[in-house]
Amino acid sequence: MTDARASQVHIRDARLEDRDAILDVTLAAYQEYAARMPGFWDGYRQNIVASVSDAGEAEQLVAEHGGAIVGTVLLYPPRRMRLSQRESLDMPWPEVRLLAVAPSARGRGVGAALMRECVRRVRLAHGAALSLHTTDLMQTAMRMYERMGFVRAPELDFHPAPGVTVKGYRLDLEKAG
């Protein structure tokens, strides 16, 4: 995406009236994984709906282009993340979750713009690092994260289902440019 096109994307805090559009964009963005992880998809879809419907302590951001929401992300503070009724994972840094770009807006820098805003906000709060989780199915996202300077953080990995590894990544903000 050229600088001119990137500047046409406006990142802002989500509003209550954005909720339906956020859910539509998020589900559309993640729908491609339904066929690739059928045994896991139903639970993951429920998690997406619950997270978007009640972001809790997370900052919910949206990317707008031409007056339409074309991307969204959740930015959580450090916390203890519940993985199941018995398991949890300490997240020592702020965490990006559910980065989603409408399929029609992909390749235009929307995801990168949302990520840069998350980095900016964590830096403003004097955070030392930013974390996220992803899977090997999300190769495009993984390449973007690595270009931005994220590195593997295996201590944040977890296994929500047999054969499914959710990989942790971290961006050290003291080293990142």
Where do the language-model regions lie?
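Conserved glycine-rich acetyl-CoA-binding loop
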Residues: 98-116, 125, 136-143, 147-148
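C-terminal "cap" of GNAT-fold acetyltransferases
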Residues: 28, 92-93, 128-131, 135-177
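Short acidic N-proximal helix/loop "leader" segments that mark the beginning
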Residues: 1-4
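Extreme N-terminal starter segment of soluble prokaryotic enzymes
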Residues: 9-10
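Acetyl-CoA-dependent GNAT
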Residues: 13-19, 24-103, 115-117, 121, ...
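Short coil/turn segments at beta-strand junctions that form active-site/ligand-binding loops
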Residues: 59, 126-128
